[in-house]
């Protein structure tokens, strides 16, 4: 029988935090599924008014759960997962609203599509399972980082309880996988396993190209510490992977590159000012929007003041918010998804005090168990 001392030691292990997070988020998913007659298409977020993708899904799955209006991101990833290598774009990718933009985010649909071997019925379940596992992995990674800051690994719950990631789960988005890979990369770099970190940053960037911010930020921090080879690989290899996939896509999809393919990016500050007008009529959006702005200011101050890996890795999300459009800023649902990695990084950077992970050696407490 386990003694109290052994139990306490076990509860301090990041792996326990990850498993606990997986169990909790799975319980949430089970609760949601029970309300929709165990229909996994609920998490694919097909929309009533997205007629072409709705017909595509119903042809392959039969009756599906429909969300109001156009639905959300999961509907695009379902299409992509049915042809993750873009081998038949005329039947799949070209029904997406912005094919080049959507198919650039390839890693999540590749995994959910079983590398191209899963059928539609397996895919719609796999999309959910991948996100549930990623939520546990993300919590584990944040717990590992927290232990490097001489804090309780239970701060890993900052990943699980992140409103942006919870929303991503609900709509079948790729943000959880991207976030888990990014925080996993930071944990690996802190543990002196830079090449594993580079691999995870590549995964993150191929899941959501905005995660190149983390790669460049982490590389910049390593460069300033004199780790030039690791810094170069950290910044360059994820970018090379993203560019390589982009080139491949342009051999598969016969569309010209244009600004219409880029979503959510506009003239600096315009989106924020336009969103503020709509916030006046919605107190919840106003409160969340102002809280995000305050968090951005505090994050910049803390990152510059304490000069650590967490700060530099995620600092680039701050200037990104300046160019987000009104469509992203106007609702708490969308803005928290856009800055979800920054929300968790903010907890690590601000709430845990001055013991910064960027100043912990590779022989830190990260090496002490899972």
Give the location of each predicted region.
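Short hydrophobic/aromatic helix or loop-helix immediately within or flanking a transmembrane segment
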Residues: 71-90, 94-120, 341
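Membrane-lumen/periplasm interface segments of specific transmembrane helices
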Residues: 25-42, 215-220, 224-319
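Membrane-embedded glycan-lipid processing machinery
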Residues: 100, 104, 115, 122-133, ...
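Specific aromatic-rich, kink-prone transmembrane helix
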Residues: 141, 161, 168, 177-197, ...
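Transmembrane-helix signature of polytopic, membrane-embedded enzymes
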Residues: 122-126, 140-161, 180
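Start-transfer (signal-anchor) and selected internal transmembrane alpha helices
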Residues: 1-56, 367-370
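Transmembrane alpha-helices of multi-pass, membrane-embedded glycan-processing enzymes
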Residues: 100-104, 108, 112-116, 127-141, ...
């Amino acid at each position: 029988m386990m003694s109290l001392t052994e139990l306490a030691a076990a509860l301090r292990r990041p792996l326990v935090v990850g498993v606990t997070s997986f169990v909790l988020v799975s319980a949430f998913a089970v609760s949601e599924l029970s309300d929709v007659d165990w229909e996994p298409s609920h998490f694919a977020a097909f929309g009533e008014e997205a007629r072409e993708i709705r017909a595509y899904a119903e042809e392959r799955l039969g009756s599906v759960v429909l969300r109001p209006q156009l639905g959300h991101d999961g509907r695009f990833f379902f299409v992509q997962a049915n042809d993750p290598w873009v081998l038949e774009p005329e039947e799949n990718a070209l029904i997406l609203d912005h094919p080049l933009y959507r198919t650039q985010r390839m890693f999540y649909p590749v995994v959910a599509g079983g590398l191209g071997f899963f059928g539609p019925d397996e895919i719609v379940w796999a999309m959910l399972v991948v996100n549930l596992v990623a939520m546990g992995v993300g919590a584990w990674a944040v717990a590992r980082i927290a232990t490097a800051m001489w804090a309780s690994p239970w701060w890993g719950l900052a990943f699980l309880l992140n409103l942006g990631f919870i929303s991503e789960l609900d709509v079948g988005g790729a943000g959880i996988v991207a976030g888990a890979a990014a925080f996993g990369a930071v944990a690996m770099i802190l543990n002196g396993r830079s090449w594993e970190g580079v691999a995870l940053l590549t995964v993150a960037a191929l899941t959501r190209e905005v995660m190149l911010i983390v790669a460049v930020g982490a590389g910049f921090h390593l460069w300033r510490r004199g780790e030039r080879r690791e810094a170069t690989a950290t910044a360059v290899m994820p970018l090379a992977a993203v560019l390589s996939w982009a080139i491949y896509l342009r051999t598969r999809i016969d569309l010209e590159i244009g600004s219409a393919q880029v979503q959510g990016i506009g003239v600096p500050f315009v989106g924020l000012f336009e969103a503020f007008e709509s916030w006046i009529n919605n107190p919840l959006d106003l409160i969340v929007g102002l809280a995000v702005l305050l968090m951005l200011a505090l994050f910049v101050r803390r990152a510059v003041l304490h000069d650590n890996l967490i700060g530099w890795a995620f600092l680039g999300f701050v200037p990104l918010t300046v160019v987000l459009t009104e469509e992203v800023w106007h609702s708490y649902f969308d803005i928290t998804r856009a800055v979800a990695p920054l929300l968790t990084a903010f907890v690590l950077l601000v709430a845990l005090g001055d013991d910064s992970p960027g100043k912990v050696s590779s022989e830190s407490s990260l090496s002490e168990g899972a």
